[in-house]
Curated annotation (Swiss-Prot):
Sites bearing Pyrrolidone carboxylic acid (Glu), chain numbering: 25
Keywords: Disulfide bond, Growth factor, Pyrrolidone carboxylic acid, Secreted, Signal, Toxin
Positions of the UniProt region annotated as Disordered: 117-143
A single GO cellular-component term on record: membrane
Species: Protobothrops mucrosquamatus (Taiwan habu)
Family: Belongs to the PDGF/VEGF growth factor family. Snake venom VEGF subfamily.
Role: Snake venom VEGFs may contribute to venom dispersion and prey subjugation by inducing vascular permeability and hypotension. This protein activates the vascular endothelial growth factor receptor-1 (VEGFR-1/FLT1), and consequently promotes the proliferation and tissue factor production of endothelial cells, the neovascularization in the chicken chorioallantoic membrane, and increases vascular permeability. Also stimulates tissue-factor production and human monocyte chemotaxis.
Disulfide bonds: 38-80, 69-115, 73-117
Any single GO BP term: vascular endothelial growth factor receptor signaling pathway
Subunit structure of this chain's protein: Homodimer; disulfide-linked. Interacts with VEGF receptor-1 (FLT1) with a high affinity, whereas it binds to VEGF receptor-2 (KDR) with a low affinity. Does not bind to VEGFR-3/FLT4 and neuropilin-1 (NRP1).
Signal peptide from the UniProt entry: 1-24
Protein's UniProt name: Snake venom vascular endothelial growth factor toxin
InterPro entries in UniProt: Cystine-knot_cytokine (IPR029034), PD_growth_factor_CS (IPR023581), PDGF/VEGF_dom (IPR000072), PDGF/VEGF_growth_factor (IPR050507)
MF terms (GO), sorted A to Z: chemoattractant activity; growth factor activity; toxin activity; vascular endothelial growth factor receptor binding
Length: 143
């Protein structure tokens, strides 16, 4: 058995993992283009971002997978925007640290069903010269 595992490990080192992407391999342009397009994709969303009033509880896991719009548009004046949404349930464990109790429950999250590139609203475009309201004037990596 040990010889078999060693042979498999050596084969992976030589040929790469079975996913087809060898370490250091160049991804073809069309695959890069297709994968970067504005579309729904699975993203991990923190529960407290969707339910900010639930800070007195802990959740396991602390984030849930949902489909959300993401990707690049062909023009900087456009942004990838959800054009369809639905509500989906995710089972999570709610922990009440004060009572020492926990229970599994279903929480609802918005999931995107369709996306398209749409013009940015005037407040979304920032040329970088003037900070948006609430942003610091400068960002220093050492602060």
């Amino acid at each position: 058995m040990a010889v078999y595992l060693l042979a498999v490990a050596i084969l992976f080192c030589i040929q790469g993992w079975p996913s087809g992407t060898v370490q250091g391999e160049v991804m073809p342009f069309m695959e890069v283009y297709d994968r970067s397009a504005c579309q729904t994709r699975e993203m991990l969303v923190p529960i407290l971002k969707e339910y900010p009033n639930e800070v007195s509880h802990l959740f396991k896991p602390s984030c849930v997978p949902v489909l959300r719009c993401g990707g690049c548009c062909s023009d900087e004046s456009l942004t990838c925007t959800a054009t369809g949404k639905r509500s989906v349930g995710r089972e999570v464990m709610r922990v009440d640290p004060h009572k020492g109790t926990s229970k599994i429950e279903v929480m609802q999250f918005k999931e995107h069903t369709a996306c398209e590139c749409r013009p940015r609203s005037p407040g979304d475009v920032n040329d970088g010269r003037n900070p948006k309201e609430g942003e610091p004037r400068a960002r220093f990596p050492f602060v």
